[in-house]
């Protein structure tokens, strides 16, 4: 994967808004169906992945248990920036990975807690908009009230 102008702009933006070694999450546009993600971003930007599940693979990070752990990692590491890369979302391999797993809790978490701050072709950079209070606990309390 070569670093082109879009990637350079994305890296520069994150470097200007975070500290070296700070955790950021570089994910896919959607996490219920995966092809690949841009893990080179972590190396180029000199930023850390907040979770051991940074290399996204169908059948792993598309499961409820792993997405739940990823959410807990994003919360516990106080990740303020999330990068959603939509480049490979439409890729459909000739196997079961072309179908949605139906698990969308990571995307729901990102949508509920991060707001768009910058965009580039196929890339959206989001900034944390809510406090780090434990998303599952807030979600459970909200469901009890309803």
Kindly label every feature range from the protein language model:
Residues 2-9, 62-66, 98-102, 106:
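Soluble or luminal CAZymes and related metallo-dependent hydrolases
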Residues 81-146:
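Aromatic/acidic, Gly/Pro-rich catalytic loop(s) in extracytoplasmic/lumenal soluble domains
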């Amino acid at each position: 994967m070569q670093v082109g102008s879009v990637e350079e702009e994305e890296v520069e933006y994150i470097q200007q808004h975070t500290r070296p070694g700070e955790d950021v999450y570089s994910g896919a546009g959607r996490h219920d169906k995966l092809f690949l993600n841009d893990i080179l971003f972590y190396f180029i930007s000199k930023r850390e992945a907040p979770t051991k599940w940074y290399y996204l693979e169908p059948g792993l990070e598309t499961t409820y248990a792993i997405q739940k752990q990823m959410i807990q990692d994003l919360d516990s590491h106080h990740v303020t920036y999330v990068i959603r890369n939509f480049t490979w979302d439409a890729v459909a391999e000739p196997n079961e990975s072309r179908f949605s797993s139906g698990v969308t809790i990571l995307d729901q978490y990102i949508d509920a807690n991060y707001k768009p701050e910058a965009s580039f072709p196929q890339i959206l950079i989001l900034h944390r908009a809510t406090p780090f209070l434990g998303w599952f606990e807030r979600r459970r309390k909200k469901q009890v009230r309803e």
